């Protein structure tokens, strides 16, 4: 029995909807790429990657300072500092102990302590994330702690332990290395954030987590 023309049209319509939904999901799931590959504002962009090796045997923090020019930031840069231009500003991003201060500049934040181990050599990967509400990152894990500095908007992160929300001016979000996670931009404003992955230098900073499925806690 030949399928009717109407049934064929229904199949075509349903197939088109499925393709559109899959394409939409792929478009909303963001993978971080080098800033040299940037083609637009939205997305997750790797702005710098710095080898730090072993860290001091004390509580470790991420220090964020801004400067009027790149030259001024580079003049204040220490051995564990990185200068990036991101979100319209020149930043000196430094991994050091509590209370550390560079010369000059404007202190923006001190985030930590970061959960690190004394015997591990570390590298710092810095990123700029600009997500519209609803955009996500695929389930993944890191080989060291991740921290955000949220300039605008809101981000919800689900892990097996539950969820945490980062907002501009809100409490710090620090995630230890190892557990899987799934990130979603929430709220009503575009998320703009600086991101640090302080990872084991002998391992990739980020790996997919196909062995874990989020419960959708960030949709509630």
Residues covered by each model-derived region:
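Short acidic-glycine-tyrosine-enriched beta hairpin
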Residues: 36, 65-72, 160-180
């Amino acid at each position: 029995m030949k399928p009717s023309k109407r049934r064929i049209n229904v199949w075509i319509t349903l197939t088109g909807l499925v393709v559109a939904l899959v394409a939409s999901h792929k478009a909303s799931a963001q993978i971080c790429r080098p800033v040299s590959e940037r083609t637009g504002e939205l997305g997750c962009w790797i702005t710098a990657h710095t080898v730090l090796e072993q860290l001091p045997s004390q509580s470790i923090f991420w220090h964020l300072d801004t400067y009027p020019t790149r030259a001024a930031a580079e003049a204040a840069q220490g051995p564990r500092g990185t200068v990036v231009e991101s979100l319209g500003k020149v930043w000196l991003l430094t991994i050091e102990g509590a209370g550390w201060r560079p010369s000059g500049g404007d202190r923006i934040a001190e985030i930590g302590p970061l959960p690190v181990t004394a015997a591990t050599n570390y590298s710092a990967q810095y990123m700029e994330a600009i997500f519209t509400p609803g955009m996500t990152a695929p389930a993944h894990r890191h080989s060291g702690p991740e921290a955000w500095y949220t300039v605008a908007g809101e981000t919800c992160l689900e892990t097996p332990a539950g969820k945490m929300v980062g907002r501009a001016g809100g409490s710090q979000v620090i995630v230890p290395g190892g557990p899987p996670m799934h990130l979603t931009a929430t709220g009503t404003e575009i998320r703009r954030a600086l991101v640090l992955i302080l990872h084991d230098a002998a391992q990739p900073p980020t790996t997919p987590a196909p062995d874990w499925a989020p419960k959708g806690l960030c949709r509630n």
